[in-house]
Design a protein with these regions (language model features):
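Residues that define the transmembrane beta-barrel architecture of outer-membrane proteins
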Residues: 24-30, 61-65, 100-104, 136-142, ...
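Start-of-domain marker
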Residues: 20-83
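Outer-membrane beta-barrel transmembrane domain signature
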Residues: 119, 123-203
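Transmembrane beta-strands of outer-membrane beta-barrel pores
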Residues: 38, 49-55, 84-90, 112, ...
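Residues on the lipid-exposed face of transmembrane beta-strands in outer-membrane beta-barrel proteins
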Residues: 32-36, 67-71, 106-110, 126, ...
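Short loop/turn motifs that connect adjacent beta-strands in outer-membrane beta-barrel proteins
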Residues: 37-43, 72-77, 113-119, 150-160, ...
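Membrane-embedded beta-strand positions of outer-membrane beta-barrel proteins
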Residues: 45-49, 80-82, 108, 122-124, ...
């Protein structure tokens, strides 16, 4: 019943996003996250596929494909990732024009549990960005995630949980070529959502994310599947 309610909310929110016609209005992100730890090994892999739309469906904002190799030192409580991402960005409206980006990244993921039911995760990420028609750039990111089970103390099957995160982006270079500059602060994302643990390998989340830069702000509906392969 809880899972059916989750699906109903998904489609009601999607219908609402279709009614938006302005690029500053709420868009939608559809995301699939995957991870795998090799048996009896400190090595694994993880990644994500994301389709981001300006309005709901039919007007691509971004297509992001990202994956990396992971290493988890014994008894260290941290997971390191070396990965690559490819990003295609579209223009709002009728234009079919796109721009591309290749991105190498290094990441440290540190989980932490506070009390009986507060699941924190710290993510530190450093990116080397090769953006079309721009000079080489780097960027620093820090994300603090918090998941709080509502109907149990653990993120176990059938658990409904509150999901929050805040992510800060800082540019490593101000000069991006041809006399163009960006500011030190790149953007900030704040998210509030609800999740459902279907089984030990799969969980779903639905929520709303507000993204702000120095120039603009935009809300996004986010629908995600998290899969331990």
């Amino acid at each position: 019943m809880k899972f059916k309610l989750f699906i109903l909310v998904f489609f009601l929110a999607l219908n609402s996003s279709f009614s938006q016609v302005d690029e500053s209005q709420t868009g939608a992100w559809y995301m699939y996250f995957f991870s795998h730890q090799f048996k009896d090994s400190q090595w694994g892999f993880q990644g994500d596929f994301q389709y981001r739309d300006w309005q709901g469906l039919g007007d691509m904002e971004q297509l992001l494909l990202r994956s990396g190799i992971t290493f988890s030192p014994k008894d260290a409580g941290v997971k390191f990732t070396l990965g690559y991402g490819n990003v295609t960005t579209g223009q709002f409206g009728e234009s079919d024009e796109t721009s591309g980006e290749s991105r190498i990244y290094q990441e440290a993921l540190i989980p932490q549990k506070l009390g009986n039911r507060f699941y924190l995760t710290h993510r530190f990420r450093y990116e080397q960005r090769f953006v079309e028609n721009q000079d080489f750039r780097t960027r620093y990111r820090y994300n603090l995630f918090l998941n709080v089970p509502l109907n149990s103390k653990e993120l176990s099957p059938k658990a409904v949980y509150l999901a929050l995160y805040n992510e800060l982006f800082i540019n490593g270079q101000m000069d991006i070529g041809d006399g163009r500059e960006v500011q030190l602060f790149d953007r900030n994302r704040t998210y509030l959502g609800v999740g459902y643990v279907l089984n030990p390998k799969i969980r779903f989340q639905f929520g709303w994310m507000n993204q702000k830069t120095n120039a603009w702000g935009k809300g996004q509906l986010q629908f995600s599947m998290h899969h331990n392969i």
